[in-house]
């Protein structure tokens, strides 16, 4: 599973209220959530300016705060195929995997990244390449069980496929 795209770099401690502000939690429409993704972050125009396939790159503790699936859903339905960060809040990590949003921990890649760089991420082998800077980094590699969930598109789809086989 190879993912390639332009990055948008965010700071440390992006919490779920910055990813999807609480004022939008009265909807469960994923496309409506996506239209407000990152609205309360340091890049409030992200939802309007990013292109499908662009990648979010952030510092440590991405997704901290309230436990809500709305945050990874907003990111996924905005067309962001992966989030790369120095570290993730544990509940965000689990929610992201459950809805089929790949997340990758790679401190060195984040430290050296700049807005607009092109990343190529090999999830299967735990490799992040900054194509712009021609640098390659080792990232945390997913166990096969989590890769199977991601390949299926999330935990529900994975469970359905297991039950039907």
UniProtKB/Swiss-Prot annotation:
InterPro entries: Aconitase/3IPM_dehydase_swvl, AconitaseA/IPMdHydase_ssu_swvl, IPMI_Swivel, LeuD, LeuD/DmdB_bac, LeuD_type2/HacB/DmdB. Keywords: Amino-acid biosynthesis, Branched-chain amino acid biosynthesis, Leucine biosynthesis, Lyase. It comes from the Bacteria. SUPFAM superfamilies: LeuD/IlvD-like. The keyword Plastid does not apply. The keyword Transmembrane helix does not apply. It holds the Pfam family Aconitase_C. It catalyses: (2R,3S)-3-isopropylmalate = (2S)-2-isopropylmalate. Its EC number is 4.2.1.33. One of its GO terms (biological process) is L-leucine biosynthetic process. CDD domains: IPMI_Swivel (cd01577). GO terms for molecular function: 3-isopropylmalate dehydratase activity. Gene3D superfamilies: Aconitase, domain 4 (3.20.19.10). Pathway: Amino-acid biosynthesis; L-leucine biosynthesis; L-leucine from 3-methyl-2-oxobutanoate: step 2/4. Belongs to the LeuD family. LeuD type 2 subfamily. Catalyzes the isomerization between 2-isopropylmalate and 3-isopropylmalate, via the formation of 2-isopropylmaleate. NCBIfam families: leud, LEUD_arch. Heterodimer of LeuC and LeuD. This is 3-isopropylmalate dehydratase small subunit. It comes from Hydrogenobaculum sp. (strain Y04AAS1).
């Amino acid at each position: 599973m190879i993912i390639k795209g332009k990055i948008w770099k965010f700071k440390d401690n992006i919490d779920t209220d910055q990813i999807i502000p609480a004022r939008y939690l009265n909807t469960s429409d994923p496309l409506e959530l996506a239209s407000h993704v990152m609205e309360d972050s340091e890049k409030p125009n992200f939802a309007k300016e990013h292109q499908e396939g662009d990648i979010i790159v952030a510092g440590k503790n991405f997704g901290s705060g309230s436990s809500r699936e709305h945050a990874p859903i907003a990111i996924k339905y905005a067309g962001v195929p992966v989030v790369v960060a120095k570290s993730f809040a544990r509940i965000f990590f689990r929610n992201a995997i459950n809805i089929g949003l790949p997340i990758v921990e790679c401190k060195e890649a984040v430290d050296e990244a700049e807005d607009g760089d092109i990343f190529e991420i090999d999830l299967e082998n735990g490799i992040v390449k900054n194509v712009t800077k021609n640098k390659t980094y080792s990232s945390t590699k997913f166990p096969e069980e989590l890769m199977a969930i991601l390949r299926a598109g999330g935990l529900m789809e994975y469970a359905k496929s297991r039950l039907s086989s």
